[in-house]
Amino acid sequence: MTDSERPRISVVNDNPDFLELMSAILDEDAGYEVSLFAGERTTAAELAASAPDLLIIDLLLGGVSGWELVVLARADQRLADVPVIVCSADVAELRERTGELERIGNIHVLEKPFGVDQVTELVERLVGRAVTRTG
């Protein structure tokens, strides 16, 4: 499977360690093509340019709400149907936004901390399994 055939995942987070971890889990281990975006300055246009099959967005991006980016992504025709995983350690906020999640649609929650199996199983369910690269 070539890079262009692997499912593409764009990850937005303001924590470089988290981005490195997600790249290790999803690209190096699971075989997805991963694009990393460092936080609050990320725009929906940048995400759309990466042509993702899946978005993973943290809810708190350096003081800016990740919800804003989710809403902007949904308003962009190129991202309107792309599934989104929102990540947060703030379980209370996730519960408060349940109605909004349902209204926006195709939004999935990943509570921090999460295990490697949790994230890979959710990603597989949403975009399919990547074929592990050899060599």
Where are these regions (language model features)?
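Residue-level signal for the "D+5" position in two-component response regulator receiver
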Residues: 36, 61-64
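Two-component/phosphorelay signaling modules centered on CheY-like receiver
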Residues: 16-35, 104
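Acidic catalytic/metal-coordinating carboxylates
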Residues: 39, 65-71
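Active-site beta3 strand of CheY-like receiver
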Residues: 50-57, 61
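Hydrophobic/aromatic residues positioned on beta-strands within the core alpha/beta folds
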Residues: 87-89
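Alpha4 helix (beta4-alpha4-beta5 surface) of REC/receiver domains from two-component response regulators
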Residues: 68, 91-110, 117, 121
